């Protein structure tokens, strides 16, 4: 009996093992070819799946089986759940619909989830976003707010350009105020002798003649200013042979006595009074000052007027950078040039004298018309040196460069 029971048990175990092997074989047939131990890169599998061409295989059956195999290698259904596979498909489609510049940057970071992709795209938008600028424009009698962009550059008012006038000596510009011009007179000879500037031999004053020179300068400050504009600035040196023994040389002006501490410490101001050791040229004093217009100031009436007013009377107008004489009657804005005022008035009147011959659109400036005509001609003169992409405006090219540099 025991032997019979052992035989029946062994036969049952063999039958069950045969059934298990049969089931495993059927499952392997349904699953297809076994997976390789070393799984390839999912990104490479995705690219192979997307770039697969029908011409690479002999027929439709082989093409379909090849696509199935590439898709399984990419999605790996044996390792991933349905939700993970759906996430991969959504991520791929989301990357596909992104702009090319953003898509390239996101793929370079190799995100592992859709949340990472969204974070990268938001960071990119936050970095490239600028605060919008608005400008008020009068159109058909009504003020309208328009966003200021590169294409609307011609419609906006350019910032006022104020040229910097070069430094001129006192022969061309108006002299300093009386408070500044008299600073030199208020300093006594005792002060100049103790000044740290006078480390080298200084001009000697002849006894009681120095106070007389100071009194002469105070009595006639206009004469001092007029003669100070020319090379020999010491007016008392010519009155009856008094004053300094060695007058100033050519090229000196009245601004030199008012030396500040910065000028003392600079290398250019190491020897500020060395010119007293040289003599002026007599021929330079005798000929040019006779015909100089400042010499006629002594003969003019109204001696109480300031020297700047007399210069204006002689035709010396103030520089254009100091005034904006052209004023808009509508908004009160002032301009330096009349052409700027005319251009500004088009904002209020809505005048657009420049018309496009292709579509009939009108513009307020000729530069804006040229930018607009590039739309019709297809001209894109600004090209990126890294990727070769062309743009119509330089501002768009600058914004594109930020994508390469990651600004």
Swiss-Prot record:
Its biological purpose: Transcriptional repressor.
Protein name: Zinc finger protein 174
Tissue spec: Expressed in a variety of organs, but most strongly in adult testis and ovary followed by small intestine, colon, prostate, thymus, spleen, pancreas, skeletal muscle, heart, brain and kidney. Also expressed in umbilical vein endothelial cells, foreskin fibroblast and Hep-G2 cells.
Keywords from the UniProt entry: DNA-binding, Isopeptide bond, Metal-binding, Nucleus, Repeat, Repressor, Transcription, Transcription regulation, Ubl conjugation, Zinc, Zinc-finger
SUPFAM superfamilies noted in UniProt: beta-beta-alpha zinc fingers, Retrovirus capsid dimerization domain-like
Protein source organism: Homo sapiens
Homology family: Belongs to the krueppel C2H2-type zinc-finger protein family.
PANTHER family hit by this protein: PROTEIN ZBED8-RELATED, SCAN BOX DOMAIN-CONTAINING PROTEIN
GO biological process, one term: regulation of transcription by RNA polymerase II
Protein location: Nucleus
Biological classification of the source: Eukaryota, Metazoa, Chordata, Craniata, Vertebrata
